[in-house]
Amino acid sequence: MKPGIHPDYRPVVFHDTSVDEYFVVGSTLKTDRTIEWKDGKTYPYFTLDVSSSSHPFYTGKQRVVQAEGRIANFNRRFGQFTSEKE
């Protein structure tokens, strides 16, 4: 392998904020945030909105989506102003 062209592969702590779950996975993700893990070591830290711990496909449970999409937000605010052509 050529030196200097491959990304830095290291353990990273991912935090699923919707269910407050933490897990360590090997990744090449770059982040400036760090967190001290249960083993006393400091790891890079990254937050997630959805992971296998919270996604309905993996959990088998439906959940209310808290972050509404931009289009749905636009339609909610301005949907009443649509003109109907006759």
From Swiss-Prot:
One GO CC annotation: ribonucleoprotein complex
GO biological process: translation
Keywords: Ribonucleoprotein, Ribosomal protein
InterPro entries cross-referenced by the UniProt entry: Ribosomal_bL28/bL31-like_sf, Ribosomal_bL31, Ribosomal_bL31_B, Ribosomal_bL31_sf
One example GO MF annotation: structural constituent of ribosome
Family membership noted in the UniProt record: Belongs to the bacterial ribosomal protein bL31 family. Type B subfamily.
Assembly and oligomerization: Part of the 50S ribosomal subunit.
NCBIfam families cross-referenced by the UniProt entry: L31, PRK01678.1
HAMAP family associated with the record: Ribosomal_bL31_2
Name used for this protein in its record: Large ribosomal subunit protein bL31B
Organism: Vibrio parahaemolyticus serotype O3:K6 (strain RIMD 2210633)
